[in-house]
Swiss-Prot record:
Residues 216-377 form the TrmE-type G domain. Binds 1 potassium ion per subunit. SUPFAM superfamilies: P-loop containing nucleoside triphosphate hydrolases, TrmE connector domain. Mg(2+) binds at residues 230, 251. Its EC number is 3.6.-.-. The gene is mnmE. This is tRNA modification GTPase MnmE. Its main location: cytoplasm. The keyword Calcium does not apply. (6S)-5-formyl-5,6,7,8-tetrahydrofolate binds at residues 23, 80, 120, 454. It comes from Sodalis glossinidius (strain morsitans). GTP binds at residues 226-231, 245-251, 270-273, 335-338. InterPro entries: G_TrmE (IPR031168), GTP-bd (IPR006073), GTP-bd_TrmE_N (IPR018948), GTPase_MnmE (IPR004520), MnmE_dom2 (IPR027368), MnmE_helical (IPR025867), P-loop_NTPase (IPR027417), Small_GTP-bd (IPR005225).
Length: 454
């Protein structure tokens, strides 16, 4: 679809509300205003006006705002109508606007996409709009605001600028090999490269924190029947999310809870007890349990401390350990310390972290919560932080790889051409984050996940 079309959409959620907002952006925003309002509102000044149908009858009345481009969110002429929030009246207004020649319904995220294409926002800032809307905690919302205001983009621009300056030196050494000073071997370039690598690593650390705030961690509670998995889910959730009985196999299906640990989203999944299935329903539940385990970020292996003195997973349940995906983080949770009299503690057993606690009484739960945060490297600090997506982490990792490869070329052989190429590729990877270097396919995937009116 053409970017020169005039687009319109609801900017508020569907359903009843006190206020409903319609947004129009494009070259026909002013003619739409004249047709609908009988006049063009003064720029950037709220006016209370009737919203009229094509026969002159009043459909609604409310606040009209007109923002001439380029001084608007999208960089185009923008009309905003704030009327009553009834779905019927909003639909009538939307039909009235779309009936005008040259106006169409906006695609998801098209307003933000136009803001990006018109240099009102870079890509990381545009993504921050969606992240702010989807924020599930106060910390995530604050970090999304920081990203929207350019905190993340600013760090990336600083790195790109440093890389640009470094490339100038390297290109000079390549283009003027007969100069008396050998820029590549004198140490200046290596020192500058090390500085950029260190700065990039600091940004990567902050980005990983931002990604945890946005995505959270998927923790699957697994174990044999009646080990206390559902009790642990309830203890972490702070409510009775799962039915708990003394009957083994009470949980037949996957149960999910979404909580926060000092701002970090935690997706807790309780699964059916793993054993040879007694019936078809239980067999299906166990299959689903294994699917969740295989996709987990972390597995909590529940052990019934009252039923066995063993805690070493390799001895206690070798078949379970053998089936886990390679490299899967596993924490052994030895439950029912209130019955066994064992001390609440964190220890190591055969390379696995072992936490002894009581899910029923809550003793030792703070140890588990702290461990879960530490296992993902979450620090909880958000002041000045920003949110990051998986694609941002991938781009930062790619840039770091190219810089390390460039350093190897410089230190081992002083190959200026190869170093210059690695620096160029690193800069390109960083530019993908802000959208200075992005494919149309990437832009389409990003903006299609936005709300219609954003």
């Amino acid at each position: 679809m053409s970017q020169t079309d005039t687009i319109t959409a609801l900017a508020t959620p569907p359903g009843r509300g006190s206020v409903g907002i319609l947004r129009v952006s494009g070259p026909l925003a002013a003619p739409v205003a004249r047709a609908l309002l009988g006049k063009l509102p003064r720029p950037r000044q709220a006016e209370y006006l009737p919203f009229r149908d094509d026969d002159g009858t009043t459909l609604d009345q409310g606040i009209a705002l007109f923002f001439p481009g380029p001084h608007s969110f999208t960089g185009e002429d923008v009309l905003e109508l704030q009327g009553h929030g009834g779905p019927v009246i909003l639909d009538l207004l939307l039909q009235r606007i779309v009936a005008m020649p040259g106006v169409r319904i906006a695609r998801p995220g098209e307003f933000s996409e136009r803001a990006f294409l018109n240099d009102k926002l870079d890509l990381a800032q545009a993504e921050a709009i969606a992240d702010l809307i989807d924020a599930s905690s106060a910390q995530a919302a604050r970090s999304a605001i920081n990203s929207l205001q350019g905190a993340f983009s600013g760090r990336i621009h600083e790195l790109v600028k440093a890389l640009t300056n470094l490339r100038i030196y390297v290109e000079a050494a390549i283009d003027f090999p007969d100069e008396e000073i050998d820029f590549l071997s004198e140490g200046k370039i290596e020192a500058s490269l090390n500085d950029v690598i260190a700065r990039l690593e600091r940004v990567r650390t902050e980005a990983r924190q931002g990604s945890l705030l946005r995505e959270g961690m998927k923790v699957v509670i697994a174990g044999k029947p009646n080990a206390g998995k559902s009790s642990l889910l309830n203890a972490l959730a702070g409510r009775e999310a799962a039915i708990v009985t003394a009957i083994a196999g009470t949980t037949r299906d996957v149960l999910r809870e979404h909580i926060h640990l000092d701002g970090m989203p935690l997706h807790i999944i309780d699964t059916a007890g793993l054993r040879n299935a007694g019936d078809e329903v239980e067999r299906i539940g166990i299959e689903r349990a294994w699917r969740e385990i295989e996709q987990a970020d972390h597995v909590l292996l529940m052990v019934d401390g009252a039923a066995t003195p063993l805690s070493d997973p390799d001895m206690l349940w070798p078949a379970f350990i053998a089936r886990l995906p390679s490299g899967m983080p596993v924490t052994v949770v030895r439950n029912k310390a209130d019955l066994t009299g064992e001390s609440v503690a964190i220890s190591d057993i055969s390379g696995y972290l072992l936490i002894t606690l009581s899910a029923q009484s809550g003793v030792g739960m703070d140890l588990l919560r702290t461990h879960l945060k530490q296992s993902m490297g979450f620090t909880g600090g958000t002041e000045g932080g920003f949110l990051a997506r998986r694609r941002h982490l991938d781009a930062l990792e790619t840039a770091a790889t190219h810089l390390q490869q460039g350093k190897e070329q410089l230190v081992s052989a002083c190959y200026g051409e190869l170093l210059a190429e690695e620096l160029r590729l690193a800069q390109q990877s960083l530019s993908e984050i802000t959208g200075e270097f992005s494919s149309d396919d990437l832009l389409g995937r990003i903006f299609s996940s936005f709300c219609i009116g954003k």
